[in-house]
Design a protein with these regions (language model features):
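Amphipathic, well-ordered alpha-helical segments in soluble domains
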Residues: 1-4, 27, 34, 75-78, ...
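Short, hydrophobic, well-ordered secondary-structure elements
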Residues: 21-41
Length: 120
């Protein structure tokens, strides 16, 4: 999903203006939520049943990297706002989308590392 979001970000043009920011936000947020589910399946089964906001509150303890957990929570919040159309808000800029995308990539890499260590 992250690759698809990155491809959309790199190919955005005037013909798709207004559509691609929300599509990128949806794909990126889904990638973050998938990484959370992967983490909980190994570290704390059952947490995935809680709201994403509650999962993000628990994240620093289980991830082992408080700064990265905060970045993931910040990215999720921004991505969630971007996924919903509000007439009084501008869509996110490509720079914002890229920053959130990079935060999700780092988070997913850390989750893969944590999950891999548990399986060893």
């Amino acid at each position: 999903m992250v690759c698809a979001a990155r491809n959309l970000l790199e190919r955005a043009d005037a013909a798709t203006a207004g559509m691609w920011p929300r599509a990128i936000a949806l794909l990126t947020r889904q990638a973050l939520e998938d990484a959370l589910i992967e983490l909980w399946s190994v570290r704390a089964s059952g947490v995935e049943g809680c709201s994403t906001r509650a999962q993000l509150l628990c994240l620093p303890y289980y991830l082992g990297d408080e700064k990265l957990a905060e970045q993931a929570a910040y990215a999720w919040s921004g991505l969630s706002r971007a996924c919903h159309q509000h007439p009084y808000e501008l869509p996110p800029t490509s720079a914002e989308l890229l920053a959130w995308l990079q935060a999700v990539e780092q988070f997913a890499a850390q989750v893969r590392s944590v999950v891999g260590k548990k399986g060893d």
